[in-house]
Amino acid sequence: MADDPSAADRNVEIWKIKKLIKSLEAARGNGTSMISLIIPPKDQISRVAKMLADEFGTASNIKSRVNRLSVLGAITSVQQRLKLYNKVPPNGLVVYCGTIVTEEGKEKKVNIDFEPFKPINTSLYLCDNKFHTEALTALLSDDSKFGFIVIDGSGALFGTLQGNTREVLHKFTVDLPKKHGRGGQSALRFARLRMEKRHNYVRKVAETAVQLFISGDKVNVAGLVLAGSADFKTELSQSDMFDQRLQSKVLKLVDISYGGENGFNQAIELSTEVLSNVKFIQEKKLIGRYFDEISQDTGKYCFGVEDTLKALEMGAVEILIVYENLDIMRYVLRCNGSEEEKTLYLTPEQEKDKSHFIDKETGQEHELIESMPLLEWFANNYKKFGATLEIVTDKSQEGSQFVKGFGGIGGILRYRVDFQGMEYQGGDDEFFDLDDY
């Protein structure tokens, strides 16, 4: 979905925050002991600490003893969390503390603090019977940044659009000679001069685009829209002077009736549909590439939990592709009376069969050391295997086919791997039932 690893890492961060939002929204507490605190990047820790001290004084007057103690406890937890930071991190700080009531009716303390993956320009402090995640949700909605080049006969404008924020990066005007029938014997010379000036103008636009939209050898926008009233935009998109890296990012050519800032606004309006589908298109492209490896039988692919984990262990996986709602759980069990551990990967159906958790020889239950969704384990560990992780949906035709046909887990490999001819060492420790995929 993303051409460079940093964008893929960002997608994983987004998935983690989506998961966090889901669990925070579901949490409920008694009284108003659940604190949501968001500190924007340029704020001071000392100001927030003073505000919390004032709140502590106010909360001491709460009449209900139970509520008073739980609110004071939550404020103290937040104060302890803030002590871990000398200053507010570059992207701001998000803290959630409080006592929640679990499904079994038990009370459980929650303390979460993290720096979001991009600046959060919201200041928030709320005590309530639920956590407030609206600012985090807003952070996810406007993620990708798009570049715009508005080019016509009178000048060029370069801008970006991220969410609802548009920014003009650079603009310049140009004075190109118009076509005319005068000149007599010099008519050809005039035409040649005009073509030369036009050529130089397109070159200047192409060079400026590289300066603005490529940083550190990588394109810094998710896609480019070329807009204009004449055929300059077409000329630019097909020109050899236009950088190949930018050429591959062009999403759409848009016809507009104005130049400059008005043209920029019109270009944004006319390309909204394309921009909203970018993630969708990237996903189709990624899974399409995966299917190509399979149809050409290159051997540079894997699917299903067992093969994918083998390939990861070998360091062969370049791109690990996992369905966002993959329902496979990863269990680490310790066999009773020994230090030996075994790892199981089970679907909800398989989890119902308790024999997986019982030692066949002794009939005793294994000790559960760790259990978490497999996707979460991948999100925490994929870098150790030298892979990039792409989390996909089933909303596109390709995505749906990937989930139904390949179990929602697979990978594009760096080199050919023969899984059938390979005896997996320690394979007895793992449990897979491939009938379920």
UniProtKB/Swiss-Prot annotation:
InterPro entries: eFR1_2_sf, eRF1_1_Pelota, eRF1_1_sf, eRF1_2, eRF1_3, Peptide_chain-rel_eRF1/aRF1, Ribosomal_eL30-like_sf. It is found in: Cytoplasm. One of its GO terms (molecular function) is translation release factor activity. GO terms for biological process: nuclear-transcribed mRNA catabolic process, nonsense-mediated decay; regulation of translational termination. A motif (NIKS motif) lies at residues 61-64. Keywords: Cytoplasm, Nonsense-mediated mRNA decay, Protein biosynthesis. NCBIfam families: aRF1_eRF1. Belongs to the eukaryotic release factor 1 family. Component of the eRF1-eRF3-GTP ternary complex, composed of ETF1/ERF1 and eRF3 (GSPT1/ERF3A or GSPT2/ERF3B) and GTP. This is Eukaryotic peptide chain release factor subunit 1.
